[in-house]
Amino acid sequence: MRVKREHLTVLLNRLYDRGDGSFTIEHPSDEIGELVRVTLASHDSCTVRFSTGMDEYAAARQQVSLEYGDHVADDLPEAAEFRNAVIASGIIDFDNRDEIETFLDRYGDPDLMAGHPPVFAGFDTNLMPWRIDRVLGLNEPGSGVGYVNGFVLATGVRDELDWDYKCHNTDPFISAFGRSYEEYWNQPLGSARIGRLGLLTYRRIRDIEQAVEVQSDQGDEAIINAYDTYDQNQRSDIILFSNDRNFVERARAHRLLGQHVAFPNTYPRKSTATWRELELLVYMLAVVFGVIEVPSVTIHGVWRGKDQLDWQHERVKLDARSPKIEPKLEGDLSIVESYDELN
């Protein structure tokens, strides 16, 4: 069954009701195995324990490469991408959140009534897959209230994300990880899935938020030049964010306001999460890993026949491994979807 990301509460509820209030999210392979352990509680006090450190995960990924080849291992996210997916859920934070908040307090939230120029945010390519506008809290979805008045998007960022590397031979993945990888046929592999996440963020900001698209070639210098040209031609201030210090320094050399976004190098032992953050975590891990498992259910981030609408609506595919849970999930999902249609 195909499920929108915001309806994954149905799965969490069903796990809780059947006695799996504490469960693991796992990769199907023996080499990778357990990723995180989740304990469900009230809506804002669930617990996520990080079973595998970044170095430990990197070593396990290397073992996959040794046993099955680089082609198979490259489908797994790098340790940094695994961490970034967790950050995108909001469960762990950036290393320099205080510095970012100070930057936003200083340069964001302009007083337009007093004649101050509006502030627009722009991003480097490396941040786009990770729901960066939402995680930074730049404005409130729907209301537009927040630190910035809108966004500037360089088309070079879009083009750096817009590439596809699809699976046309599922046999190596089935041999390494199991029969669930039959669903990989004609679906994006590895970094291409992460690029697709970035494109979704780009298009959401462009089409739904207050955004201006500026033409640019690919590459840091071309992207920064496009932001700089827009900044000079418009009465506005642009603030740029990147995980790359060189990008930030180049932006500052153009007299643009740049802020480095630092990711942590380790996981905390555990973290508190809301149910909504757990929905995001399950969705992000399903996409970056391709396939994950929870008790009695396999969750596919990609599957044979997944199309653009499935990506746009952030759908995953649930395959019940237990005949008891499948009709209950289908019934719960039908109720939730009917409620959405009525509202």
Labelled PLM ranges:
Residues 1-123, 127-239, 246-343:
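Feature 3881 marks metal-assisted phosphotransfer/nuclease machinery
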